[in-house]
Amino acid sequence: LVELRLPRAILGALVGFSLGLSGAAMQGLLRNPLAEPGVVGISSAAAFGSVLALYSGLSASAALALPLGGIAGAVLATILLFVLLGRGAGTTTLILAGVALNAFAGAATSLALNLAPNPYAALEIVFWLMGSLADRSLAHVLLVLPLMLAGWALMLSTAPALDALTLGEDTAASLGFDLAWLRARLIGGTALAVGSAVAVTGAIGFVGLVVPHLLRPLVGNRPGRLLLVSGFGGAILVLLADTALRLAPIRPELKLGVVTALIGAPFLFSLVNRMRREA
């Protein structure tokens, strides 16, 4: 229980909180309800870093090589993102830089799959990319916990500025908020939280997109108040999804990323249908 179940539950809660919080933060920053943590390219870069650890064989020789590779990928992508953006970049530049990072990391991951030495190596990479909490230990929790806590602190500190940003960038600036510093804190916080989450679990989609949508009616048009609520909502969603796949009579065990996508996709279809009726 202590060696397997407890670390898995703790890690699931940490990852879910990171994804939910980051999703709300990105939607608040970009003022777009369709934004999600992967929009800045950090999660794709973290996934590529872990894929490199798998491809090179480092993951077989060192237990923590896989998450460390993901964290290294996230750190390098964050540095590159700040270099590309500079001090005075706006929201459009941020999105374009994120698209470029996503495209490059995705292409590099596909290249690693294409050049895999054998089908088993390619299959290992594909299965890891699907996302899972299986076989994670307390060492994984201790590795990412400080990074996640730092990321959460950065994002939660932006709550007043995000509320002001709903009035427009000019109004927020006139109220005394430094928009460049706001973007830096949100990008840095997302990089720390989501990068470390992807590094230990693989890609788990839809949590950062769906959870803020579900919980936004509870707080109204206040993105700052949505941050903490979405974090807890993300933690609950990931824990419920992981519990469901463990109890499902299917072997081998389903991947967590598959389950969250199966939960998230119907919700998005219903959201599209509701928006179509309201239009």
Predicted regions and their residues:
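Alpha-helical transmembrane segments in inner-membrane proteins
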Residues: 1-279
